[in-house]
């Protein structure tokens, strides 16, 4: 039975990691069903095993189509791909069968989202080594999703307690990140981040651009990247009509955003934004992938092989990712 709540697809991730466990725990929470209709994409055998690890007793409703879902607390609605030999699965270990299965869960989720069966997807952890062992030639979720949706350059946003953070650079050295702070790149990201916010239905407020150097360079005393690149980019963006301010010192900009002065912050390098969000609330820092024709949220932790199978993994991040997907999906513009 389908109601008017958003339908959120949840691929269960690497079946040898904590993904199945955090999903099972999440679906014991009434809040999830109050805000959305969750559907798992995975393997019934893996879910049953995860329930055993977590000492959780839920019914499994294996379905072929979304409209067969019950969407009631106490029942897991599952698209069962039946693609794992549970006797061969080694919990907490890198293995090709797990990587291949995880990829198939993602692929099915994307297909359903592209066909309009899902309003968004909330993804669970996968393992890069297991993908490689399974001959899946991607390094992670974002690359898989980009390829499956024909998206050239997806944009990552973190959200925690209402604070949104974008990243000018991500997985590059700090030295290279400084070299990538150019007027052209900063302007491009201001435009793209503004468009991403609009797609999510965020229309009020201004974006802030963080400074790179101490005190945003102090007029060139501590570095000139702000004077040469950041300020000219912001001024040009303002002339184009974009609501943006900065550069604002990184020691205060996140505090100001959290207080509501800004609707988002453009962080200039990986750790600048990661430290701010994860110090605020590590478990509730959720990644939102923008720029694709589908909406995707994700936990920001890994497969945690060291505790997989113990039932110890916290589901706080997973619950938050599902709820955030439900929050944005009614406003999301493809």
Curated annotation (Swiss-Prot):
Its cofactor is a divalent metal cation. Its EC number is 1.1.1.408. InterPro entries: PdxA_fam (IPR005255). A divalent metal cation binds at residues 171, 215, 270. Binds 1 divalent metal cation per subunit. Substrate binds at residues 141-142, 278, 296. It catalyses: 4-O-phospho-D-threonate + NAD(+) = dihydroxyacetone phosphate + CO2 + NADH. GO terms for molecular function: metal ion binding; NAD binding; oxidoreductase activity. Keywords: Carbohydrate metabolism, Metal-binding, NAD, Oxidoreductase. Homodimer. Catalyzes the NAD-dependent oxidation and subsequent decarboxylation of D-threonate 4-phosphate to produce dihydroxyacetone phosphate (DHAP). Belongs to the PdxA family. PdxA2 subfamily. This is Putative D-threonate 4-phosphate dehydrogenase. It comes from Clostridium botulinum (strain 657 / Type Ba4). The lineage of its organism: Bacteria, Bacillati, Bacillota, Clostridia, Eubacteriales. The gene is pdxA.
